Amino acid sequence: MKFMKLGSRPDTFYTSEDLRCVSSEVSSDFTIEVSGSRYLLHKFPLLSKCLRLQRMCSESPESIIQLPEFPGGVEAFELCAKFCYGITITISAYNIVAARCAAEYLQMSEEVEKGNLVYKLEVFFNSCILNGWRDSIVTLQTTKAFPLWSEDLAITSRCIEAIASKVLSHPSKVSLSHSHSRRVRDDDMSSNRAAASSRGWWAEDIAELGIDLYWRTMIAIKSGGKVPASLIGDALRVYASKWLPTLQRNRKVVKKKEDSDSDSDTDTSSKHRLLLESIISLLPAEKGAVSCSFLLKLLKAANILNASTSSKMELARRVALQLEEATVSDLLIPPMSYKSELLYDVDIVATILEQFMVQGQTSPPTSPLRGKKGMMDRRRRSRSAENIDLEFQESRRSSSASHSSKLKVAKLVDGYLQQIARDVNLPLSKFVTLAESVPEFSRLDHDDLYRAIDIYLKAHKNLNKSERKRVCRVLDCKKLSMEACMHAAQNEMLPLRVVVQVLFYEQARAAAATNNGEKNTTELPSNIKALLAAHNIDPSNPNAAAFSTTTSIAAPEDRWSVSGLKSPKSKLSGTLRSKLAEDEEVDERFMNGDGGRTPSRFKAFCAIPGRPKKMFSKLLSINRNSSDKNC
């Protein structure tokens, strides 16, 4: 870092009791009071360089000159006083702002004397400070102590312009970075890490700035248009990780604020909130400029710090654009207040999903013409038609990417449902709404969804039958794997109609496989046998489908398995036949009573035969007829 020395005389200032004096053969004739400190000085050296002191002495006959609100305090005043006496002073990036403001206050300009302090400081500032990377940043940091003076003297704006111009003109000049050079010395970084770090060499250095100065600097860098959006995003991530407290610490801050509304806690939260909202306003508009994980971390902090609704909605919109990159842990956003009974903020995730579905609602384009006619037409195409084809191909790729994204998001949502299902205070409506927000085609299988439903039913054992049916109506039994079906068959938390539906579709699969010649034997597949055996059903004797009363079993763990089916103790409580009859009566009351309009999805769910008892006989008779034919 650069510095400048002015004057040649040794320092003769000394302290006597409560006074600061100058050792001289001439007695002092001038008393100045600055910030409670008194100086016994001489008029001639001071008045010859300070126009303000000249005017104050001529206007006031008092022997003591008061300098209230002196910029920089006694340190800055003493620098100016020593300059007047010709005593050696050292000016650097750390004290040039204080010295410049003090010199301006005392009016040490060229009007009073050529080569005065203001002129010398300006020359050093423009020729040395602004040309140095580290000097510019340090000087900009020191302007925080003198915001009004620094703005009036254009010190702040000139430092910001100098920093931005160096970032824009030297994007690969890593040697400028103080933080990067220090890190390379301390850390033996790999070549890949060093290369990635060198691209954003400036990010860590300007991260030392306060949020107001940082925001203005980043605006200047962004307006230059030469720095890629990804590097802007990396710089914001570096700054957020440095100044935003961790989420755990944030939660403690919020909890303390709720427990005791002290001014200090309120100020801390307000500062963090301002910092967060400023970072959000600086986010690049380009998709992928910042990672989805970073956006969701900002959203978590926004929820905890109670940021503005507009800031949270902006983050939700940005997250929706790249939601397929998120993980389940990223979506576990804590609620706004510790007073909330819910473990996670499900509403904000529902908003993100809604935004994701809205921006992905583009119909896939139709396929191009094929065949000889299409080939002949293709030969006669004009250049404009070729351009249309290119747009068509881009549209297809975009549509394919959208479809792939929805498949990933569906998997993500099912994993998220498994996590929030453990919350005993999670309302049924929120769980169902979130499960239904995913398009049906995006779930290739329903195993993860079934696992989430199973967890929810076990965590909410006080649900009545209609509520359990409402939870299960989004489940498509045709998309369950063999393992999931076998688990569902012994899951006493499921509505019995779902169990029957599982058996029905498994039998239908077995029959279809037999008709297609995939089975040379008339025996039921082993998984169907296991399902029926779990309910004490003899597949060879439909009339003997009596179901013995059993004792209830303990609910399986969240990670269900089929090992329980092999145990002779694994049975459903109550008789299946009586429960089917009871279940049928409840369905009829629900469909014909005061249930109102029946949702279309629920109608599809109830598309199995109307009388489950007859359905069981029908299933078994199909198998029996098949056996007779092969005899």
Curated annotation (Swiss-Prot):
Q: Which residues cross the membrane?
A: none
Question: Which segments constitute the BTB domain?
Answer: 28-93
What are the NPH3 domain coordinates in residue numbering? 200-509
Look up keyword Aminoacyl-tRNA synthetase and say if it applies.
no
Residues annotated with Phosphotyrosine modification = Y450
Alphabetical list of InterPro entries matching this protein: NPH3/RPT2-like (IPR043454), NPH3_dom (IPR027356), SKP1/BTB/POZ_sf (IPR011333)
Which residue intervals are annotated with compositional bias (Basic residues) in the record? Answer: 370-382
Q: Does the keyword Phosphoprotein apply?
A: yes
Positions carrying Phosphoserine: S567
* Entry-linked PROSITE patterns: NPH3
* Chain residue ranges for the region called Disordered: 361-399
The lineage's top-level taxon is: Eukaryota
Pathway entry: Protein modification; protein ubiquitination
Q: Which Pfam families match?
A: NPH3
Keyword terms, alphabetized: Phosphoprotein, Ubl conjugation pathway
Which biological processes are named by the entry's GO terms?
A: protein ubiquitination
PANTHER family linked: OS12G0117600 PROTEIN
**Domain note:** The BTB/POZ domain mediates the interaction with some component of ubiquitin ligase complexes.
Q: Write out the similarity annotation.
A: Belongs to the NPH3 family.
What job does the chain carry out?
Answer: May act as a substrate-specific adapter of an E3 ubiquitin-protein ligase complex (CUL3-RBX1-BTB) which mediates the ubiquitination and subsequent proteasomal degradation of target proteins.
Name the UniProt record assigns to this protein? BTB/POZ domain-containing protein At1g67900
